[in-house]
Amino acid sequence: MIFLKNICKNIGENAILKNVSLSIEKGEFVAIIGQSGSGKTSLLNIIGTLDTPSSGTYVFDEYEVTKLNNDEKARLRREKIGFIFQRYNLLSLLSAKENVSLPAVYAGKNLQERSQNAKKLLNDLELAHKLDSKPNELSGGQQQRVSIARALINGGELILADEPTGALDSKSGIMVLEILQKLNEQGHTIVLVTHDPKIAAQAKRVIEIKDGEILSDTKKEKAQEKLILKTMPKEKKTLTLLKNQAFECFKIAYSSILAHKLRSILTMLGIIIGIASVVCVVALGLGSQAKVLESIARLGTNTIEIRPGKGFGDLRSGKTRLNFSDLETLRSLEYLEAVDAHSNTSGVATYTNISLSARAEGVGVNNFAIEGLRIDAGRILNNDDVKNSTNVAVLDFNAKKNLFPDEKSENILGRVVLFNSQSFKIIGVLQKDTDKPIEDNVVRLYIPYTTLMNKLTGDRNLREIIVKVKDDVSSTLAENAIIRILEIKRGQKDFFTFNSDTFKQAITANKRTTTILTACVAVIALIVGGIGVMNIMLVSVSERTREIGIRMAIGARREDIMMQFLIEAVMICTIGAILGVILSIFVIFAFNTLSTDFPMILNAYSVLLGLLSSMFIGVVFGFFPARNAANLNPISALSKE
């Protein structure tokens, strides 16, 4: 079963083992005796594949161990070797049954099978009443019996016992030795390391070692031929194994987080703030953007204004005029939903003893809908008003507020106001326009543009034509077509256009830029949170080095250890992300309750992005600590206090 030839182990210039050669057959009970520093524990660690010899040959059950990689050695420990340590090496967060079951988890056995086997072993060792007890609730002898049960859960063809009675009282020590003798009688190969000749005398074969060399190897009697346990089948990556790995990792991660609540919360704080920032920034951006786009829609979405001149502020624009012929040409275009004229003039509005500087806006029937003007009381202009040049007016909010400060809108309908000595009957009052990007205090009276031209200015030319493009038509294409048609008709391009979509696109682009910049700040917060997670995970690896060594000793693969710490990092980040989302929901609710300007809009994609990014942060910043844990040397890890 075990064959060692010329095994040497050097640490620096010190020779721990010197050309050790021996063989151990299946079913033997061998005691390796020696004083402290003799090399007996180093030899046991090499036999148990926890340590690697500096030179020599080691064959275990027809496998040349010196040529196996770390995971292949872990498989040997998992399937064929069971360890009994002097200090028990039980995991403090697990119950007796869970400690015993742990090697079976890494072996891929299902929950029912490993639970039944663990209960049977503990029952056989008179611990049926301690299944759910934690190690600190057990006596030394009971802990050692749990350790023996753990060594047997996967079969334990070879049992390696390192000073198993060293920390026990005499009664418990005798019980442990009796258990080992009984296991040997059942066919288990036992290798016992001790410094006590009386304990060594219980074995059938004693090997004495001193200063790294074998002094004697005596067989007291021939080993009994007993039933040899079957070799476990070749390992396969089954679904059960993957489920076991994931479940065990989640359970340990959860226990670790609960065991250090304050530290875990402080670690999550960076993630919580980062995720809440991401969700709130997106919600703020969507809310403000929706408000602006709604305002633009009310101001006139898909609208194009045609004005004389080369552009805003053109001094020669006064010499250029648009006319009714241009208006009719545009009305004939089928891709335009509405076309109307717009002119204005300044003057004085008077009601009783109140006189104000005001502006008369000459508009058509469609202007109110095109510009998004909403009626508060009364009605808007109709076709008869425009056709007959009627002296009627619709007051805006500023006109109503200044001319009729203490009256309701519906109470002033039918009254007459003067504008530049012309009397106008009030037929409607507009709502306050809260959608304008910049609030102004201009007093406006909306009258038929025909009334303005015929009775106020005498000018038959138009200051502006405003059109609304159909929803299924590109406003840019429509604008280009209008420019070409009017340019051909007028013989020159002595006018300019303003497309509301240009303003809309500029606002959207500005909001997008602002959102990106703010999101960058949130991402930085996430990265800072991720660095905090990595720092805590490095501390966790350092604190749990001994636990890692124990898991490796009972057969955990490197990927098992790595997955354990990666899942813990991801779990911390995910819990932090969930708390961050919950916090952001409260913030959004509070903001929407208190703010009347615009709402914050919670976006499902931003929540999903936050959760996914937190997992990504967990993987990225948890990888380095997890890799460090997986690369630990089992012997160094086990010796860590």
Swiss-Prot record:
SUPFAM superfamilies: P-loop containing nucleoside triphosphate hydrolases (SSF52540)
Protein EC: 7.6.2.-
Cellular compartments annotated: Cell inner membrane
Binding of ATP, residues: G34, Q35, S36, G37, S38, G39, K40, T41
Domain called ABC transporter: residue spans: 2-236
Membrane topology, from the record: Multi-pass membrane protein
Keywords: Antibiotic resistance, ATP-binding, Cell inner membrane, Cell membrane, Membrane, Nucleotide-binding, Translocase, Transmembrane, Transmembrane helix, Transport
The organism's place on the tree of life at top rank: Bacteria
PROSITE patterns tied to this protein: ABC_TRANSPORTER_1, ABC_TRANSPORTER_2, MACB
SMART domains the record matches: AAA
InterPro entries membership: AAA+_ATPase, ABC3_permease_C, ABC_transporter-like_ATP-bd, ABC_transporter-like_CS, MacB-like_ATP-bd, MacB_PCD, Macrolide_Exporter_MacB, P-loop_NTPase
Pfam family membership, one: ABC_tran
Transmembrane segments: 265-285, 519-539, 571-591, 604-624
GO cellular component, one term: plasma membrane
One GO term (biological process): response to antibiotic
Assigned protein family: Belongs to the ABC transporter superfamily. Macrolide exporter (TC 3.A.1.122) family.
Protein function: Non-canonical ABC transporter that contains transmembrane domains (TMD), which form a pore in the inner membrane, and an ATP-binding domain (NBD), which is responsible for energy generation. Confers resistance against macrolides.
Subunit: Homodimer.
PANTHER family the UniProt entry points to: MACROLIDE EXPORT ATP-BINDING_PERMEASE PROTEIN MACB (PTHR30572:SF14), MEMBRANE COMPONENT OF TRANSPORTER-RELATED (PTHR30572)
Name the record gives this protein: Macrolide export ATP-binding/permease protein MacB
Gene that produces this protein: macB
